[in-house]
A protein has these predicted regions:
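N-terminal ordered "arm"
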Residues: 1-49
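Non-transmembrane, interaction-prone alpha-helical and coil segments associated with secretion
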Residues: 2, 7, 62-70, 74, ...
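Glycine-rich loop/turn
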Residues: 5-23, 113-135
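Acidic, proline/glycine-rich low-complexity IDRs
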Residues: 5-6, 123-170
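Short, flexible beta-strand-to-coil junctions
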Residues: 12-20, 56, 162-165, 170
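Alpha-helix initiation and N-capping motif
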Residues: 36, 119-120, 146
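Structured domain cores in non-transmembrane regions
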Residues: 36-102
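Extracytoplasmic/secretory-pathway segments with low complexity and glycosylation-like composition
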Residues: 88, 92-132, 169-170
């Protein structure tokens, strides 16, 4: 996992041509979110059309034509999630339910998190805390087969079991 402090992109100045004295085109690493004024100052460019993203270290993939404002928006959304269970499991969650990182970001508020480790604990939590079956009389709580309910939940596509807890999305 890439930490927030480590999110960065390598940007090339495409207006300066390759020269034998240089090993490559002039470029530099920039921390994200990126400030275009810093790019302008360090690379000597005037517009975004004069740059190209050559490399990146981000918790999401970039397409060839991703604009800086899009990268900045995604980085800010990742920063907003920092410290949450979803932040630590975003790669697994995204791959489970979404075809792209942008789609994951668009639906992240619809993902529920349960701070338990297995199906039986999740069943107990859903019955007793969330009141999945409505209010159950306390005398009946000990007669519920939480293990069986948990096994059903574990086979559901709507739940994702991770080391950091369980996520639900429908």
């Amino acid at each position: 996992m890439i930490l927030i402090e480590e999110m960065k992109i390598y940007i090339l100045n495409t207006t300066r041509f390759y020269h034998e004295d240089f090993e490559e085109y002039p470029g530099a690493w920039f921390s994200c979110p990126v400030d275009f004024e810093e790019i302008r100052e360090r690379l000597g460019v005037q517009s975004e059309e004069e740059i190209e993203i050559e490399d990146y270290e981000l918790p999401f993939p970039l397409e060839g034509n991703t604009r800086l404002w899009e990268i900045n928006a995604l980085c800010r959304m990742v920063q907003e999630m920092q410290g949450t269970p979803l932040y630590y499991e975003m790669d697994v969650v995204q791959k489970r339910w979404f075809s792209s990182f942008t789609e994951f970001i668009d639906h992240k508020d619809q993902i529920r998190y349960y701070p338990v480790q297995d199906g039986e604990a999740l069943a107990r939590y859903l019955v007793q805390e969330v009141q999945l079956f409505g209010e159950v009389h306390p005398d009946l709580l000990n007669h519920i087969d939480y293990a069986a309910i948990g096994r059903e939940l574990e086979t559901s596509e709507n739940y994702l079991f991770t080391d950091n807890g369980i996520f639900y999305y429908r």
